[in-house]
């Protein structure tokens, strides 16, 4: 449980930083929606899901896939209430789950859940392999 929480909060922290950077860029760029920034921010969030899995897989290298998937999903789950608070505080005409430009759409939430689980598993698998290799190297070396 501890590796999953560690990875989830690592990923959520990175997503928070990416979102703050995105908000700053949104204020600085005149036509944010038609620029390349939304794609860049989305890719950075995908990397954060991978880092969530990596953070969990480093601590629990024996079960990287389940640990990484749960850490990635946890990062997304921790971020959702924060995003709702941001929506509530901002003076914005967008609906939370309805309207033409809703903050959360069913498709968007589903895609993020799939990416969070998959990239969390990839990150944990990479970290787990690295840790197992390091541990095997330590046990094979003469003391």
Model segments located where?
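Juxtamembrane/disordered regions of integral membrane proteins
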Residues: 1-143
